[in-house]
Amino acid sequence: MRAGSNVKLCTKVLIRNQHTYQGSGVSYMPPKPENGATHSSLSPAQQAYLERVIRVDQAGELGADLIYAGQYLALSHNKKVKPIIKHMWEQEIHHRSTFNKLQSEHRVRPSILTPLWKAGAFGLGFATGFMNKEAAMACTEAVETVIGKHYNSQLRVLSNNFADLKDSNDKFSNSKEIEHLKGTIKVFRDQELEHLNTAIQNDSKNARPYWLLTETIKTVCKSAVFVAERI
């Protein structure tokens, strides 16, 4: 099969999964709040931080989606690994869709460097998948290690700096909107860590050169997070 046909097939699978998995993801997502404290009760600093969270997480999940898309294309011939990557990819599609909606609902501008994230993420996924299965899994291990720590950091800030907000009745209470966001991040963090464990179980540490590959990818991911929060 030609490379062009493979890309078309990969795109069709991505679109199909994007429709099917969103429905299946509803059952494990925390319910969206119907009332309670909202953005109007946040200070300018809190509002700015919340926008950074949504912007960087949307960019990160976009990147994860396309990393797995690249790996899926490169390893589509591997019958053992293909369903494993597909499962993780489907979860990332749902993560991306969720943050796309949050970005739209709260009118948060996307990262200006979104085209770069798209090209870089797909290229990274395809390149490591083209190397071999172990390199692809080492890539997953490195990315999910950074993202797991990133989500934990966000949860600490949201728990410590967004408590006791004033609601519409001028009373102090926990923001249901913030609690919903925290619940969403917790679910996604746990799934990212599942991907990390899956990568280790599928021989990520047998990649060569393991240390150079994983540390390089971690550095790239950390830099991307830093930039996407701000630009």
In which residue ranges do the predicted regions lie?
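Non-heme di-metal
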Residues: 2-231
